[in-house]
Amino acid sequence: MTQDPHKMFDEWMDEAKKAETDDPTAMALATASKQAFPCVRMMLLKGHTKDGFVFFTNLGSRKGHELLENPVATLLFHWKKLRRQVRIEGAATLISDEEADAYFATRARKSQLGAWASEQSRPLPARDVFEKRIADIEARYEGKDVPRPPYWTGFRVSPIRMEFWNDREFRLHERELFTLNDGRWQSEFLYP
């Protein structure tokens, strides 16, 4: 039995990248408001190390507000073809500006422009308003590199719990839970 859930995650992700044709890095991100109302949405994992799991967003979005007010999150990866899922719980912290800048520079130009144009999660009166904003920003940065907006950054979820779930016949699933205690991972199996 492995005692390193990060290594196990990497192994499962490698298998998912071979088996899943559509976004094996897709994950559900659950946050909660200060009033404890949960909200979940799909995101893409953009990095994983022993320090945590990184994704990027607009701080003005609902998830941005919730993570700043209540900096905890749960991630869920579901790989249907492999009949597996991984659930990760932990503290969410902002990444460094340098890390956010480096990732932003790798994004497609249209995605960079969209980050400037979108007032994410705010009401949009009509689609053409958004398209005009994109065109205006595209004109502003014509022939120039697009810098990262100050409100666009990443979060790192540093896990304290990681559960690995394997589907089994007759709903006799296999669940292994890793819990971080005093800097060491402990594992146990759970009833399905």
From Swiss-Prot:
UniProt-annotated binding residues for substrate: 46, 103, 107, 111, 171-173
Co-factor(s): FMN
Catalytic activity from the UniProt record: pyridoxamine 5'-phosphate + O2 + H2O = pyridoxal 5'-phosphate + H2O2 + NH4(+); pyridoxine 5'-phosphate + O2 = pyridoxal 5'-phosphate + H2O2
InterPro entries xrefs: Pyridox_Oxase, Pyridox_Oxase_CS, Pyridox_Oxase_N, Pyridoxamine_oxidase_dimer_C, Split_barrel_FMN-bd
GO terms under biological process: pyridoxine biosynthetic process
EC number: 1.4.3.5
UniProtKB keywords: Flavoprotein, FMN, Oxidoreductase, Pyridoxine biosynthesis
Cofactor note: Binds 1 FMN per subunit.
Pfam families named among the record's database cross-references: PNP_phzG_C, PNPOx_N
Alphabetical list of PROSITE patterns matching this protein: PYRIDOX_OXIDASE (PS01064)
Spans through the membrane: none
Binding site for FMN: 41-46, 56-57, 62-63, 85, 120-121, 165, 175
Pathway: Cofactor metabolism; pyridoxal 5'-phosphate salvage; pyridoxal 5'-phosphate from pyridoxamine 5'-phosphate: step 1/1; Cofactor metabolism; pyridoxal 5'-phosphate salvage; pyridoxal 5'-phosphate from pyridoxine 5'-phosphate: step 1/1
Record bears the keyword Transcription regulation: no
Keyword Iron-sulfur (UniProt): no
GO function terms (MF aspect): FMN binding; pyridoxamine phosphate oxidase activity
Known function: Catalyzes the oxidation of either pyridoxine 5'-phosphate (PNP) or pyridoxamine 5'-phosphate (PMP) into pyridoxal 5'-phosphate (PLP).
Subunit structure: Homodimer.
Stated family: Belongs to the pyridoxamine 5'-phosphate oxidase family.
Protein name: Pyridoxine/pyridoxamine 5'-phosphate oxidase
